[in-house]
Amino acid sequence: MPDQVVTRFAPSPTGFLHIGGARTALFNWLYARGRGGKFLLRIEDTDRARSTPEATAAILQGMAWLGLDHDGEVISQFERAPRHAEVALELLAQGKAYKCFSTQDEIQAFREAAQAEKRSTLFRSPWRDADPATHPDAPYVIRIKAPQSGETVIRDQVQGDVTIRNDQLDDMVLLRSDGTPVYMLAVVVDDHDMGVTHVIRGDDHLNNAARQMMIYQAMGWEVPVWAHIPLIHGPDGKKLSKRHGALGAQEYQAMGYPAAGMRNYLARLGWSHGDDEFFTDAQAREWFDLDGIGKSPARFDLKKLENLSGQHIAVSDDAALRHEIEAYLAAAGLPALTQTQSGDLERAMYCLKDRARTFPELIEKAAFVLASRPISPDEKAAAALASVSDGILAELTPQLQNASWTRESLEEALNAFAEAHGTKFGKLAAPLRAALAGRAVTPSVFDMMLVLGRDESLARLRDAAHPA
């Protein structure tokens, strides 16, 4: 095995980057990055009828959002078809593959007869050991000569040793009659040529591994380390599907989940490091290994995703968070922030991010800094303003005018004002929130006043004291 770890993610471009694929990409990325290796990207676009440029773009965009950078150029499997065919012809020349002239009708007749006689329907070609001199001038496929006795053992890092009797393996087609290679051949040739050392993929590919091993062994190539990871199930224990909610990675971006939270959650979806739930990217790269992957399907839990996302928002750098929120607005098709709003949002981030689980929740709390005068109070805020006389706010404004506009001076001024009116600051907080933000649920009054600054805060208080 080469010294450098090389992993790959090889999606088919027939749709968006779904959650299962995103997790597979993440596991490959973490394993390679944590070992100073390479993470490669191959687009398996051999199915020309279903592969689309739009799907390829969606996959690349989803990976970019998740921060899963790859090494080197994106490999197109379709463009490598001549190389795949070359390997099939090499096996043919070595006597490890053969030309099969059996027609589809003949194969179907063989299987029907086998079924009627209650014997194996596995097709055994009469052309396997035929003298080439007897070959007709007719279309043919190239089949590999599968071993007919013994066992094939898949040494899997997740599933353990999986043993398959060789008499259960057919002589797989490598090259179709039109000269195009089959997927099973293309995967092996590409992985070998790309230097892939570890194949980490869904366990729905486990059955393919035995057939792919035949090609590795026939070519005398080193077999990579296999790690077949369980699929993701919904909360009800059934395979994750549309009815369980959003499936595409970009849908979660548009819903306002931070990429770091999504990476953390996907990493924990089927892999564990002790009891650690929350961890940074650096910790994930350091800790991730194949031994920590469980055999049982993981269940997708939106509440856990929300909780982890909230923790990542809380510890994020303010500028980076503002930048990601702007990307979220674009992904969700929402209006972009103005330059002024962008700067104001970043300044306010310290008092917004502690309790937000998603970007929509954070933006809701940021309404006070994104709004412009005159502030229109919602129903609860209007009720809070109506609970005090306009004169109270009008009287308060000049007293704040001379405050030095620090948290300490504002607290002192507002508490003194409340005491002078025979009440406590808590009684004034609701109308002040309403005046400053037009909402009943906001960051603290002092945080809002500090973020808005003296002039804007006083102007909003005056507006509320003298409504139009």
Curated annotation (Swiss-Prot):
GO molecular function annotations of the record: ATP binding; glutamate-tRNA ligase activity; tRNA binding; zinc ion binding
EC number: 6.1.1.17
Motif 'HIGH' region boundaries: 11-21
Transmembrane regions listed in the UniProt entry: none
Keywords for the protein's UniProt record, in alphabetical order: Aminoacyl-tRNA synthetase, ATP-binding, Cytoplasm, Ligase, Nucleotide-binding, Protein biosynthesis
Binding site residues for ATP: 242
Domain of life: Bacteria
GO terms classed as biological process: glutamyl-tRNA aminoacylation
One Gene Ontology CC term in the entry: cytosol
Record flagged with keyword Ribosomal protein: no
Location(s) in or outside the cell: Cytoplasm
Catalysis performed (reactions): tRNA(Glu) + L-glutamate + ATP = L-glutamyl-tRNA(Glu) + AMP + diphosphate
Family of the protein in this entry: Belongs to the class-I aminoacyl-tRNA synthetase family. Glutamate--tRNA ligase type 1 subfamily.
HAMAP family per UniProt: Glu_tRNA_synth_type1
NCBIfam families registered for this protein in UniProt: gltX_bact (TIGR00464)
Role of this protein: Catalyzes the attachment of glutamate to tRNA(Glu) in a two-step reaction: glutamate is first activated by ATP to form Glu-AMP and then transferred to the acceptor end of tRNA(Glu).
Entry-linked PANTHER family: GLUTAMATE--TRNA LIGASE, GLUTAMATE--TRNA LIGASE, MITOCHONDRIAL-RELATED
Subunit annotation: Monomer.
Record's protein name: Glutamate--tRNA ligase 2
Gene name of the record: gltX2
